[in-house]
Structures are given as structure tokens and as C-alpha cells.
Amino acid sequence: MLRPGALRLRGLALRGSPRRPSSAGLREGQESPASPPEWKDRAETVIIGGGCVGVSLAYHLAKAGMRDVVLMEKSELTAGSTWHAAGLTTYFHPGINLKKIHYDSIKLYERLEEETGQVVGFHQPGSIRLATTPVRVDEFKYQMTRTNWHATEQYIIEPEKIHELFPLLNMNKILAGLYNPGDGHIDPYSLTMALAAGARKYGALLKYPAPVTSLKPRPDGTWDVETPQGSVRANRIVNAAGFWAREVGKMIGLDHPLIPVQHQYVVTSTIPEVKALKRELPVLRDLEGSYYLRQERDGLLFGPYESQEKMKLQASWVTHGVPPGFGKELFESDLDRISDHLEAAMEMIPVLKKADIINVVNGPITYSPDILPMVGPHQGVRNYWVATGFGYGIIHAGGVGKFLSDWILHGEPPFDLIELDPNRYGKWTTTQYTEAKARESYGFNNIVGYPKEERFAGRPTQRVSGLYKTLKSKCSMGFHAGWEQPHWFYKPGQDTQYRPSFRRTNWFEPVGSEYKQVMQRVGVIDLSPFGKFNIKGRDSTQLLDHLFANVIPKVGFTNISHMLTPRGRVYAELTVSQQSPGEFLLITGSGSELHDLRWIEEAAFRGGYDVEIQNITDEFGVLGVAGPYARRVLQKLTSEDLSDDAFKFLQTKSFNISDIPVTAIRISYTGELGWELYHRREDSATLYERIMSAGQEEGIGDFGTYALNALRLEKAFRAWGSEMNCDTNPLEAGLEYFVKLNKPADFIGKQALKQIKTEGLKRRLVCLTVATDDVDPEGNESIWYKGKVVGNTTSGSYSYSIQKSLAFAYVPVQLSEVGQQVEVELLGKNYPATIIQEPLVLTEPARARLQKDGKKTNLEKGPSRTTKL
């Protein structure tokens, strides 16, 4: 056992930095005079918060040439969570884009000491994640294929290599390790001071103590930032206030979904076996034991993540606010909470049993509901940006500072990072939900990360569709931006449990039945989570012509349109319907609702357009009806003529279905004959029941989003967030049909796209068939050719029509021809894949056109690379 001297620390309110270098006192003494006495009454950017993230942003903005960067800290730099952090740094992240953030952070930290002259205390002994179960080995294989097409070094290593790198381990249960060279740890205090020195070197002003007391927006989009020392007029503000971020948000009426969590770690005295080592131990992560462990001088530092039942939220701070003056304080330690993890660590690293504990640190870190930070501009409040919710702020700080700086300076994100968008949360994100999800996220820190993962705490939210009660007992629901939406349906006798897997699991056969339901008969899907906006006004047409690369649809018609960034990348995909002259209905995906709305609102403000923009997402439900018998079923319920001649593809009309008012758009993401029916949310259940009743003779049935994904892939329909995002341009994504470079309007990104077209493409999106066994592509897997990684998948599914896996992938142009053979890496094995002519299955409108022209309509022979709907 750890020696009982540790227990004497229980009940003590520990004070002071647990790891501050002996020279830190001198540096800290030099810090106050370094805070300049001058005051600026104007600033380009005011950053609120002097933790590692805020100081990093100040450094990056100033270094990039922005004048008048002002950082305001309420007490002193590093106060809050930075000063007591364990300081871990890693290239690894399961999220694709966050790997770039981690990479940028580490590369900055490697050069920062030379650049600023400040010691940062950066150690890079590498890190090892331990697999002690077969499913964990599968997870490592899954993560390898998602990493191979990145710059990050990462390897699966055998037990012998693990023992060589970390000779103090008990190897009895270890099956494999995931090894990242270059990982390690850094002193958070020294890092922040180095960033501060760099920020000042490049002209930023760092003021502290300078608590912000008031934020006042002005009509021109600027802000008055008030402090006891005076007021500053700022073109933008960035809330980087850590666990004070909620208080800052409340100054302007925002309730950020953040909550402080108590996180403990233990520091031991010198351990002879550690001291005797000739090199520093790599950072260790025992995932089943749910803890990290690293060398601290000649001892060890051990940090666990307790279960959600044992962990402790600082919920009182959400209710009553952070105690005044709290800055470099800690909570009372509680070793009982982490005793199970200590025992697991002592079994894995036996030398811990005879170690003395010299310090227990229990400090606050801030969690968002999904554990990811909130980074970017906030919808509904102009020029208000956030960089908060960092559960892992030290490794995120450098990269996020660079990311935000680039976005602020260039008007668009440097790469896609939608998972950190603060606008992924909305009014549905209550305090109760935030608490439940933060507790779950903390407790799930080290669980196996499966594809199609679902987490159930805090559900359902208040944001359920009108069909939730009707459908919940017969389907597996998925969570989408607060909504519950059916993923797949089950029938009596089928396995209904949530069984995540890296291979095909219990939903595979039911989804196949739903696929056949739509292809052979008629299916109904709840699409209520769609984001829905109404735009009208004198300048509505001009605004949309400026925003979208496609032409504006005629009255009574719909088209698919894309908003591009100034650099010609795909910011969003929406359907645009002109309901009446100058009045438009815009539809986007559930996950991009406020993301897209903010972009539209900002363009309207900047251009001075006279428009009215309404978010009607929660007011309306949507039912999708699709399949060869869709028209026959719906025609029973309305006097409106639904024939091809009367109701054309992409046409929109408003009429009644069984006395229920609907706006119907003839479009379906399945690619089959279908309509989307927009209606009052309170009418959803009645409309659904009447459609299902009318379709009994046709064998009508439900289908969910898993079947929808299989259907859209066969039709070669792209998905925003997968095939297209801020990392892609529409030409390489095969979206030429929807981009009208010859239209008169100078839409955002037009000139950049012309330049891209002139220079030629370097890569292209292709469709692949993959000869697999019991595993299917999910997206972001590596594409191999002649022993080298040449690209990546973007999404995938099983094709129930040809009984093979299907995937979209980006590959070099020279490897993009139909018939080209490549390989797709899945769970550590490379499977043969072939580029096919897309679409695999023709859409219903395309089949109808060919039939009208008297041509053969082989469902599995698409005529061209680009599918015209």
C-alpha cells in the first residue's frame, strides 16, 4: 500500500502550486513590474482571461501583426485551472481535427523557449496507452487508420517494447500499447509566462489585476469593456475566462453550458527504482484503470478519472457563482474517491506500493457537456468569441490560440473544427443537462471509443419532436443537437439493446430491412431535427445571391446550395426554397443549425441587407416519405395533384394532407421518389398516423438515419461534415453542378474558386467498393497505394444492393480514375478497394428521365461522376 503518511493530507485545504520550479518565485516577482502601467482606450481585440489559452491567443494575434491586442485578467496569470494542471501533452486525440490542434501545440512548445528566452520545462519522453482487453486492441487498430494520414507519429507496440520503455510495469495483463513519440508534459506556469513574454514582445498589452465588470455591445458591433481601471472600446471580445466564463457570459445574457469539475492527482516522493532509471519514463495511460501516470522528478505523478458515481462536480458555482477571490486555491483532497484507481495503479506499477505521497492536488477544471471546448464566434451576439470549456487546456492552448488567431484575422477557420463550435449548444442546453453530461463525460474519459457511439445521460432534452412518444418504444434513438432521432427500428424478437462494436452489430440486419422498405415499397422517416430558417424582406434575394454559389431558385422551386468561405471552401450546404416572391425557406442539418445561422446573420449585417431572418427550427416538424409507392400513399390523403407533370422534382407547394397544412418539397436524401413534409410541430403525431394508416396496402414502414446513410451513399449524395466542410472546396468534392461561377452575383468565395479551378485540383472525391468481411468503413480511414498512405475515406456503409462495403474517399487526382485499385485500412488490415463510376444506384429522377427517353435504366450503372439530382 501507499504509505499512510498520505492520509494525513486528507481534510487539508492545500494551497500553492504543487510543482512550481524553484526559480518560479523569482520569475513571479518579476512578473508584476512587467505588467505595463499604460492603459488603452481602444483595442482591436480584448481577451478576457489570463490562463494558458487566453495568453496563447494574445501571443498568436500579436505575432501575426494585429495591433492593439489587450488581455485582461482578474487576478494574476495562470490563476484558475492553469497553475495546478498536470501539464500533459500528447499528439493523440480520437477526433480527426483535434489532432491538428495537438500537433500545433507541441510544435509551438518545442520552439517557444528559444523564441522567448523563457524556460518552459518541456519533457518529451513519449507516451503509451495500455490495452489489457481484446476490444481495446481493436480500438487501437481503429485509431491507427484514423491517424496514418496525419503528420502524427503513432504506433501499436508489442508487450516486449512496452516493457523496454517502461520497465517498472507488471506485464501480466498487457496485450499491446499505443505509442506516441514526442508526447510528454510541460510546466503550465512556465509555459504561460513564456507565451506572455512572447505576447509582450510582439506588442500585446497584458493587464492584471483587471477584472471585467461590464460588457456593453454597441450598435456598430463594437464593445465597451469596463474594468475598475477604466473602459476599453473593442472591435471584438474573446471570453477565455475558464471557470469564470459563465459569469462573463451572463453579463450579456448568455448562459454558457459549463461546469467546474474537481480533478485530483497525487505526487509521490522519490522512488529509488525511478531514480535509478537512465532515461525518463514515458507518460502512461492505463485505460481500464482510468488514470494517467508520469514521472515527476524522481517520483511519480498519478491522476485518475473517477466514475460518474464518485466524481464531484462543483455545482454550487453554477448556481451561486464562483466565490469572490478564488484564484490559486484548491479543494480539500479526498483519497477515498480515487482509492479504486490507486489500487489499480499499484497492481500495474508495483513500486507505487512503497511510495510516500507528498502532495495531493484537487483543483477545478471546466467541462462542457461533451468534454470538448467551445471555440469560435457565438451566434446571436456580434463579435463575441469564446475559448472556454477546456478539460485539457494545456495541450489545447497552443493550437487553439493559433486556430482562433487565424480565424479572426482571415474571416474563416483555417481548418474544419465543427466539433468545437460553441453554437452546437442552444437554449435546450439546460443546467440539469450540463451537469448530467459533464458527470458522464468525466466518468467516461477512458472508455472504449466506438464508432456510432451513443451516450445516454441527460436524455431526452426538452427538444423532442412531435413523434418522440410515438416512436421511442420501437426504435433505437440517436442524439442530434438536442433532438432524439431514430437511428434504426426493431421488430418483435429482435435484439433491441445498444451494442456498440467496431464490427457489424445487432442493427445490421434491421437496417437492411429498412433499406428494402424504401427501395421496394415506401418508408417514413422523422426529419424534424433539420435546422429551418425563414428569410424575407426587400433585400432577401440579393443576400442569398451573395451567400450561395448556386443560382436562386424560382418561386415554387427548391435547389441545393452551398455557402463558401472567402478561400472557396464549403462552409455549409442547405436547401433553398422560394415560397413566394422574396420569401425563402432554408433547410440545413441538425448539427449545423446555429453554425449556419450565425454566418447568414453576419453576412446580412456586414452587407447592410434589409432582411428579416427567423429561426423556426423548433416550431416545425418534418416527415420524409420515400419509395416507389410514396406518391400513391400521399395521393390518398390530398386533393393536390402529385403526378410528375403537376408536381415536379424540386418543386415546393403548400396544401393540406388530411386537413393538416403542410409545405411539401419533392426531394429525398434517399434518392428515391419522395417528399419532405413541413408542418406544425404539434401536428406531427396525427400526420404520421394518417400516413401510416393510408399506406397499409402498400406495406408502409419506418426507416431511420442508418438506412438513410446507406441509401444516400449508393446515390453518391455528399454529406456536409464528411465529404465537404471547411477543409474542402466544392470542385474537388464533385459539386460542380451546384456551383455557378458564371452567375452575375459576386458570391463569397467566387474569386478564390476561379483561382482554384485555374490552378487545377490536387485531389478528388471518389466512390469505392471495398471487399471486407465483417467490418465497414465509417470515415477517416487511411487509403493505401503501393505501400503508402495516399488519402482518406470520408464516410462509408454497407451497400445492401451489391453486398459490399461502399465508401467515399479523397485520393490524388492521378489515382482517381474509375477502375483504379487501392486499399482501405480497417482494424489493422488492408482491404482491396476499387474506384467505381458513381452513382452506384441511379436516383429516381435520373431513372425517370432515362425511361422517358426510352433508354435502359440499370439501377447499378451510373452515367457520370457527378450526380444530377
Swiss-Prot record:
<feature type="binding site">
    <location>
        <begin position="573"/>
        <end position="575"/>
    </location>
    <ligand>
        <name>(6S)-5,6,7,8-tetrahydrofolate</name>
    </ligand>
</feature>
<dbReference type="Pfam" id="PF08669">
    <property type="entry name" value="GCV_T_C"/>
</dbReference>
<feature type="binding site">
    <location>
        <begin position="390"/>
        <end position="395"/>
    </location>
    <ligand>
        <name>FAD</name>
    </ligand>
</feature>
<keyword id="KW-0560">Oxidoreductase</keyword>
<feature type="binding site">
    <location>
        <begin position="676"/>
        <end position="678"/>
    </location>
    <ligand>
        <name>(6S)-5,6,7,8-tetrahydrofolate</name>
    </ligand>
</feature>
<feature type="binding site">
    <location>
        <begin position="73"/>
        <end position="74"/>
    </location>
    <ligand>
        <name>FAD</name>
    </ligand>
</feature>
<dbReference type="GO" id="GO:0006579">
    <property type="term" value="P:amino-acid betaine catabolic process"/>
</dbReference>
<dbReference type="Pfam" id="PF01571">
    <property type="entry name" value="GCV_T"/>
</dbReference>
<feature type="binding site">
    <location>
        <begin position="52"/>
        <end position="53"/>
    </location>
    <ligand>
        <name>FAD</name>
    </ligand>
</feature>
<feature type="modified residue" description="N6-succinyllysine; alternate">
    <location>
        <position position="786"/>
    </location>
</feature>
<feature type="modified residue" description="N6-succinyllysine; alternate">
    <location>
        <position position="648"/>
    </location>
</feature>
<dbReference type="InterPro" id="IPR036188">
    <property type="entry name" value="FAD/NAD-bd_sf"/>
</dbReference>
<feature type="modified residue" description="N6-acetyllysine">
    <location>
        <position position="161"/>
    </location>
</feature>
<dbReference type="InterPro" id="IPR028896">
    <property type="entry name" value="GcvT/YgfZ/DmdA"/>
</dbReference>
<keyword id="KW-0007">Acetylation</keyword>
<feature type="modified residue" description="N6-acetyllysine; alternate">
    <location>
        <position position="786"/>
    </location>
</feature>
<dbReference type="InterPro" id="IPR029043">
    <property type="entry name" value="GcvT/YgfZ_C"/>
</dbReference>
<keyword id="KW-0496">Mitochondrion</keyword>
<feature type="modified residue" description="N6-acetyllysine">
    <location>
        <position position="216"/>
    </location>
</feature>
<feature type="modified residue" description="N6-succinyllysine; alternate">
    <location>
        <position position="469"/>
    </location>
</feature>
<feature type="binding site">
    <location>
        <position position="737"/>
    </location>
    <ligand>
        <name>(6S)-5,6,7,8-tetrahydrofolate</name>
    </ligand>
</feature>
<feature type="modified residue" description="N6-succinyllysine; alternate">
    <location>
        <position position="141"/>
    </location>
</feature>
<dbReference type="Pfam" id="PF16350">
    <property type="entry name" value="FAO_M"/>
</dbReference>
<feature type="modified residue" description="N6-acetyllysine; alternate">
    <location>
        <position position="141"/>
    </location>
</feature>
<feature type="modified residue" description="N6-acetyllysine">
    <location>
        <position position="328"/>
    </location>
</feature>
<dbReference type="GO" id="GO:0047865">
    <property type="term" value="F:dimethylglycine dehydrogenase activity"/>
</dbReference>
<feature type="binding site">
    <location>
        <position position="212"/>
    </location>
    <ligand>
        <name>FAD</name>
    </ligand>
</feature>
<dbReference type="Pfam" id="PF01266">
    <property type="entry name" value="DAO"/>
</dbReference>
<comment type="similarity">
    <text>Belongs to the GcvT family.</text>
</comment>
<feature type="modified residue" description="N6-acetyllysine; alternate">
    <location>
        <position position="469"/>
    </location>
</feature>
<comment type="function">
    <text>Catalyzes the demethylation of N,N-dimethylglycine to sarcosine. Also has activity with sarcosine in vitro.</text>
</comment>
<feature type="modified residue" description="N6-acetyllysine">
    <location>
        <position position="107"/>
    </location>
</feature>
<feature type="transit peptide" description="Mitochondrion">
    <location>
        <begin position="1"/>
        <end position="43"/>
    </location>
</feature>
<dbReference type="InterPro" id="IPR013977">
    <property type="entry name" value="GCST_C"/>
</dbReference>
<feature type="binding site">
    <location>
        <begin position="80"/>
        <end position="88"/>
    </location>
    <ligand>
        <name>FAD</name>
    </ligand>
</feature>
<dbReference type="GO" id="GO:0005739">
    <property type="term" value="C:mitochondrion"/>
</dbReference>
<keyword id="KW-0285">Flavoprotein</keyword>
<dbReference type="InterPro" id="IPR027266">
    <property type="entry name" value="TrmE/GcvT_dom1"/>
</dbReference>
<dbReference type="InterPro" id="IPR006076">
    <property type="entry name" value="FAD-dep_OxRdtase"/>
</dbReference>
<feature type="modified residue" description="N6-acetyllysine; alternate">
    <location>
        <position position="648"/>
    </location>
</feature>
<protein>
    <recommendedName>
        <fullName>Dimethylglycine dehydrogenase, mitochondrial</fullName>
        <ecNumber>1.5.8.4</ecNumber>
    </recommendedName>
</protein>
<feature type="modified residue" description="N6-succinyllysine; alternate">
    <location>
        <position position="427"/>
    </location>
</feature>
